[in-house]
Amino acid sequence: MESCDCFETHVNQDDLLVKYQYISDALIALAYFSIPLELIYFVQKSAFFPYKWVLMQFGAFIILCGATHFINLWMFFMHSKAVAIVMTIAKVSCAVVSCATALMLVHIIPDLLSVKNRELFLKKKADELDREMGLILTQEETGRHVRMLTHGIRRTLDRHTILRTTLVELGKTLCLEECALWMPSQSGLYLQLSHTLSHKIQVGSSVPINLPIINELFNSAQAMHIPHSCPLAKIGPPVGRYSPPEVVSVRVPLLHLSNFQGSDWSDLSGKGYAIMVLILPTDGARKWRDHELELVENVADQVAVALSHAAILEESMHARDQLMEQNFALDKARQEAEMAVHARNDFLAVMNHEMRTPMHAIISLSSLLLETELSPEQRVMIETILKSSNLVATLISDVLDLSRLEDGSLLLENEPFSLQAIFEEVISLIKPIASVKKLSTNLILSADLPTYAIGDEKRLMQTILNIMGNAVKFTKEGYISIIASIMKPESLQELPSPEFFPVLSDSHFYLCVQVKDTGCGIHTQDIPLLFTKFVQPRTGTQRNHSGGGLGLALCKRFVGLMGGYMWIESEGLEKGCTASFIIRLGICNGPSSSSGSMALHLAAKSQTRPWNW
């Protein structure tokens, strides 16, 4: 023992306290050694751990602490100096590591404590996401119900079926005790009960529209809670021993109901509202939730749109019925007009054959009788017969021509003719009649007037003769002159006529004919009457002349058919009158070698043409 470098213990090994300390050190060492093993195991199992180096340092600290307790087991017995040195090294190492760990924990512990805050934050976010998910699911459910209700509402376009379907579907979806719709009355002063779900109250009940609660509903687009005692909510069953159920009302815009016919619709033209009332069951267990109120608001909008579509459909059907009636009336009128046209044509055909043929015979015989020797009384009688026959023949011709103009069956003949010869022939026909009244006749043709033109020679001559005949008829003394010239392009543009649109071309020209007289004249305001059929203006002077009032009306139709325009000017009574017209004629550009043959053709034509004046 003297040569052994040992330390002797001063504790009584048989003491019970020493035994407890010995056992405690052994257990502490065992625990210290097991903790790092557990940490290493769980760190390896973890997918993510941000503080591995801290864990290694903490594990070293625990192992060294366990080593000190483990070495301390030998300190209870006699031990060598080496054991003491190992114990010292272990404690020094443990002290260094523990101090380093303590310093490191100063920075790590706040992060570890914030983990809890982050956990709470994440939990809060998770709760918010759950609420949002619940809201999304609720909105999807609301949308699904709205789509189902919309599909049920829009399956028909009958307004009563729409409202009935709405109440039934809302009652099923929301498990309602009662659901009703109040519509404005015709006067707009009351709301009338038009549709109910259970029919427990009579339809047709009314409440004044000026109630404060009704005005409040009209001014809000959202569903509103109303008291159970409100007149609108009297449709529900008796409450009894249960608490009053919750009642919600929402307005329904009447977008397009102005043309609805019926006692239960008012003429509001898109400015009124109906009110929908919804009542929950009377047991008081249910409350209105936000998504249910949103569902009610959406359904109210869909009902408004469906009613608008139904109104438009009814209006279109009503318009279609009216259009069918109008088409039927028009078809009937067309048939009657066709019958009238056929009757007129038949009449004209009969008149043309049965009246003009004997009239020509009378005119011919009267003319032959005037060439024989007659007494003055006989001559007056024959002249009267001839004059009346000519008048009747002229009226018949005018009526026939006017009828053909009106039905569009009269067509112009575009053939070359001698333009100057027409005016000379008119003068030769009018001059004997004018000489009887001692009237002078003048013919003035412009130097640039072409010799030949292309057009309807017969209608042009008929127009000039008609105007000249009127001039002779209404002129007692003085003169009658015809002026023919070509209208220049600048003169055509200066004509103040909204009815005449000249078209300039190298293939035609515009002929202007003026007939001036010194007759009785006419008031300016009476000039339009001259072109009215069967109308003769009556002025202050004596114009009691025979005629049917067709001549000038027929002339204006002929002029318009020839692409021209006709007008009359007069400065007043007893100041004469000037009748003017412009027509479009084609330019006749025949070769010079054939001018002789054209002249022969026109001469032969003038001898054989059947004039009916």
Swiss-Prot record:
Residues binding Cu cation, per UniProt: C65, H69
GO MF entry, a single one: ATP binding
UniProt-listed SMART domains: GAF, HATPase_c, HisKA
Catalytic activity: ATP + protein L-histidine = ADP + protein N-phospho-L-histidine
This protein's GO CC annotations: endoplasmic reticulum; endoplasmic reticulum membrane
Induction: By ethylene.
Pfam families: ETR1_N, GAF, HATPase_c, HisKA
Tissue-level expression: Expressed in etiolated seedlings, leaves, stems, roots, flowers, embryos, anthers, carpels and ovules.
Domain Histidine kinase: 350-589
Keyword Cell membrane belongs to the record: no
GO BP of this protein: ethylene-activated signaling pathway; negative regulation of ethylene-activated signaling pathway
Cofactor note: Binds 1 copper ion per dimer.
Domain of life: Eukaryota
Gene3D superfamilies: 1.10.287.130, 3.30.450.40, Histidine kinase-like ATPase, C-terminal domain
Protein name: Ethylene response sensor 1
Subcellular location: Endoplasmic reticulum membrane
Summary of the knockout phenotype: No visible phenotype in ethylene response; due to the redundancy with ETR1. Ers1 and etr1 double mutants display a constitutive ethylene-response phenotype.
UniProt keyword annotations, A-Z: ATP-binding, Copper, Disulfide bond, Endoplasmic reticulum, Ethylene signaling pathway, Kinase, Membrane, Metal-binding, Nucleotide-binding, Phosphoprotein, Receptor, Serine/threonine-protein kinase, Transferase, Transmembrane, Transmembrane helix, Two-component regulatory system
Primary localization: endoplasmic reticulum
Modified residues (Phosphohistidine): H353
Membrane found in the keyword field: yes
Needed cofactors: Cu cation
Membrane topology: Multi-pass membrane protein
Alphabetical list of InterPro entries matching this protein: GAF (IPR003018), GAF-like_dom_sf (IPR029016), HATPase_C_sf (IPR036890), His_kinase_dom (IPR005467), HisK_dim/P_dom (IPR003661), HisK_dim/P_sf (IPR036097), Sig_transdc_His_kin-like_C (IPR004358)
Its EC number(s): 2.7.11.-, 2.7.13.3
Its biological purpose: Ethylene receptor related to bacterial two-component regulators. Acts as a redundant negative regulator of ethylene signaling.
Gene name of the record: ERS1
